Design a protein with these regions (language model features):
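Start-transfer (signal-anchor) and selected internal transmembrane alpha helices
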Residues: 1-27, 100-109
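Membrane-interface micro-motifs in multi-pass membrane enzymes
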Residues: 106-158, 271-273, 323-332
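Perimembrane helix-loop-helix junctions
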Residues: 193-223
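Membrane-interface alpha helices of multi-pass inner-membrane proteins
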Residues: 171-187, 193
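Short hydrophobic/aromatic helix or loop-helix immediately within or flanking a transmembrane segment
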Residues: 45-78
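Hydrophobic, aromatic-rich transmembrane alpha-helices
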Residues: 273-296, 340-352
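Transmembrane-helix motifs of polytopic, lipid-linked glycan transferases
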Residues: 78-104, 152
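Hydrophobic/aromatic-rich transmembrane helices and adjacent perimembrane loops
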Residues: 191-192, 318-343
């Protein structure tokens, strides 16, 4: 009886927290849409066609204009708030699936904690966020819309990996479509997922001595449409006479204090260190537990590759100081944060069961 009361209380708190979170997201996006002064939000720019530079070449622009045409500012705010809510629910679903001892209400509360813990917005401060690496970002519509797609794609990949050697064609097709659509919205996730998948498949090839080559080849093909789309996007973005393109940051002349994200200016460097405290503690303290968890190890691989790309690569020309190569680190941190939380909950419930 006491257990049922506790679960009902957690359900109530979880639903209340989710409702408040959803309303706050709608309010925030609406305020950003109607702002007439200086604002940090990218919504107006993305709606005007500048989600891919100044080209108008963006699925986000098409979607935002369509939603705005139907519902105006309020409808657009509700749409973006619904996307934020979807991300929150995916977190809760993943926690419940991995740690079934966590009741649904508690899963919602843990999901809220994960989605808020790195997302302190500072519109009047010297730096936008507490934490240069954060999973939740409120001002960038392309990232907001990428977030649930990247999470679903991550779990679809895990479901395919669970059936090693036996390709699940529906999941394969769904993953291919999701990665392509996610790339059309923002290529940052595929820019990390593709090399991480290559590493995972090469390791699998060595481990199985080539006994699962057809499965590995087909799984590798999931990224091909997205890579083709990346090439098209690059041709659209990196044109003109300002030497636009991509390069190793150490080979370029740049002002460290102008770089929005990275390890070169004071705010970003200290924010980065703050961001790594929790996930770093899980890596060190729960090593014996997570070394057998494929989902966690793949999320760690994704983040390691994304962090390397963010530190070592930069766009050149007029986009050099925008920090766009760090978007991959943000979305992969989001996935690593979720998997780290799952590892923590698994550890806590194991200790509780032994009492």
């Amino acid at each position: 009886m006491a257990q049922n009361k506790k679960e009902r209380l957690l359900w109530g708190l979880g639903l209340l927290g989710t409702a408040v979170f959803s309303l706050l997201m709608v309010w925030l996006h609406y305020q950003q849409l109607i702002s007439t002064g200086y604002y940090y939000s990218d919504i107006p720019a993305h709606m005007a066609g500048r989600a891919m530079g100044n080209t108008g070449f963006s699925l986000v622009t098409i979607l935002l204009r369509f939603v705005f045409g139907i519902g105006g500012n309020l409808g657009t705010a509700v749409f973006l708030g619904a996307v934020n809510l979807l991300t929150l629910l995916i977190f809760a679903w993943a926690i419940r699936k991995a740690v079934p001892q966590v009741c649904p209400g508690a899963a919602l509360l843990w999901s809220l904690a994960a989605n808020l813990c790195q997302a302190v917005w500072m519109p009047n401060g010297g730096y936008w966020y507490f934490g240069a690496i954060t999973g939740t970002i409120y001002h960038n519509t392309t990232y907001i819309m990428l977030q649930p797609l990247a999470l679903i794609a991550f779990f679809l990949f895990l479901s395919l990996a669970e059936h090693h050697g036996q390709l699940q064609w529906r999941s394969w097709a769904a993953l291919t479509v999701l990665l392509t659509v996610a790339t059309a919205i923002k290529p940052s996730y595929l820019f990390v997922f593709a090399p991480a998948l290559l590493v995972a498949l090469v390791v699998d090839l060595i481990r199985t001595h080539g006994k699962a080559i057809p499965w590995e080849v087909w799984l590798g093909c999931t990224v091909l449409p997205g890579i083709l789309l990346c090439i098209i996007q690059a041709k659209v973005l990196f044109t003109g006479g300002d030497d636009s393109g991509m390069a190793l940051i150490f080979t370029t002349d740049f002002d460290p204090e102008k770089v929005l994200w990275g390890v070169f200016n004071y705010s970003a460097r200290h924010g980065l260190m703050r961001s790594l405290v929790f996930v770093g503690a899980v890596v060190l303290l729960l090593f014996r537990q997570w070394r057998g968890a494929y989902a966690y190890k793949f999320s760690l691989l994704l983040f390691a590759i994304s962090l390397t790309e963010g530190i070592c690569l930069t766009e050149t020309g007029s986009r050099m100081y925008d920090g766009n190569l760090w978007w991959g680190a943000f979305i992969c941190y989001d996935i690593l944060l979720l998997e780290s939380l799952i590892q923590l909950l698994c550890s806590l419930h194991k200790k509780y069961a032994r009492r």
